[in-house]
């Protein structure tokens, strides 16, 4: 549906350079259209129409139009992923252009494996490059305290939101590089 709509709409097709997808296991999807031109109200109207067509076919969709120094968000600039891990559901906000594990099913297995390895652990955990808290949140249940470091501002923001959303209180997020951690 998306491809057909883009091919048949000259406003959406004109200087379209790239299409990016961010999807959840539940089917929620964020589509980013990247252009080599300035986006105007005509583009926004065409994208709104596309969003309406997509919404009639599946779970929630959002569209982002990007061009040099320009970002137009129709809907949200994130998806909400829910991962069932060891008899608990964890909710993760995943932002556009921020790293997230691309395969939700494999991600669940990786997290469960890490939690199994940590099941007998005691004490505290130091996690480097925690991203949006993908491993941090589930692993925090196996430790007294967690210090999680990350460089990316958007990932730190997502991790903070994810900790709050999941009611996890034993994690401290710090914006540091691994090099800064080793110097501390």
PLM regions: where:
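Structural motif
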Residues: 29-30, 124
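Short edge beta-strands and adjacent turn/loop segments
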Residues: 13-26
């Amino acid at each position: 549906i998306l491809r057909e709509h883009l091919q048949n709409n000259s406003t959406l097709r004109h200087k379209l350079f790239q299409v990016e997808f961010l999807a959840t296991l539940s089917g929620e999807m964020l589509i980013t259209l990247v252009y080599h031109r300035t986006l105007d109200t005509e583009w926004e109207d065409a994208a709104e129409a596309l969003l309406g067509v997509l919404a009639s076919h599946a779970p929630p969709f959002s569209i982002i139009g990007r061009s040099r120094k320009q970002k137009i968000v129709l809907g949200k600039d994130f998806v909400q992923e829910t991962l069932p891990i060891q008899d608990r559901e964890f909710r993760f906000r995943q932002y556009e252009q921020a790293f997230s594990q691309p395969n939700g099913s494999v991600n669940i297995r990786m997290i469960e494996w890490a939690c199994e390895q940590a099941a007998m652990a005691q004490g505290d955990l130091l996690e480097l490059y925690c991203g949006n808290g993908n491993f941090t949140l589930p692993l925090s249940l196996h430790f007294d305290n967690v210090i999680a470091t990350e460089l990316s501002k958007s990932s730190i923001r997502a991790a903070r939101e994810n900790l709050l959303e999941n009611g996890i209180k034993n994690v401290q997020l710090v914006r540091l590089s691994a090099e800064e951690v080793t110097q501390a």
